[in-house]
UniProtKB/Swiss-Prot annotation:
The keyword Transmembrane applies. One of its GO terms (cellular component) is membrane. Keywords: Membrane, Transmembrane, Transmembrane helix. It is a single-pass membrane protein. The chain crosses the membrane at residues 7-27. It is found in: Membrane. This is Uncharacterized protein RP875.
Length: 174
């Protein structure tokens, strides 16, 4: 009886470790993509994501940028000036501080309202699997939307990686 229990625990642990290994491979396998899309979407500020989006917008990767959860409009306006981006090319979600679910709902509303079919999602590489999964599940099946991940690479701490891995696992289950 104890032996069976230990074997089950060992099997679950082995699956978890194998899955974590695959997750580490996955988050480092995203390539920087040069495809032109209908829009660029970014969730919240931090880690040079907004700067990356502005550079992509300026380079012509998409005609419009949608941002949720930006903390400072003053910083945002400075970034617009720094990158010579026209303010009309950027749509800010109405609420400054939003939950992750609200960010996703706002992005879905944006995608559906503008009938977008091809979008670039700019996100930290360790968050891309989770955010892709959440977005793809939330997009209505009547909309045929292809999401191109554009990673912002960083060296997160192990606790951040573990948390992101568990969030990804939970997004698969839900």
């Amino acid at each position: 009886m104890i032996r069976k229990f230990l074997l089950i625990i060992l099997a679950i642990f082995t699956l978890w470790v194998g899955g974590f290994g695959y997750y580490l491979y996955l988050i480092n396998s995203y390539k920087l993509n040069s495809n032109t899309t209908n829009a660029i979407i970014v969730f919240a500020d931090g880690g040079h994501k907004i700067e990356t989006c502005m550079a992509l917008l300026k380079a012509g990767y998409a005609p419009i940028l949608f941002i949720t959860g930006i903390e400072s409009t003053e910083r945002f306006k400075n970034l617009l000036m720094k990158h010579n981006v026209i303010e009309q090319q950027v749509i800010l979600a109405p609420n400054k501080i939003m939950s992750e679910e609200d960010n996703i709902k706002e992005a879905i509303n944006f995608i559906v309202t503008y009938n977008l079919t091809l979008i670039t999602l700019v996100e930290h590489n360790y968050n891309i699997p989770f955010m892709l999964n959440k977005l793809q599940k939330a997009i209505p099946s009547s909309n045929n939307v292809y999401i191109v991940p554009y990673p912002v690479f960083s060296k997160p701490k192990y606790d951040v990686l573990l948390k992101s891995y568990h969030r990804y696992l939970m997004s698969i289950v839900n």
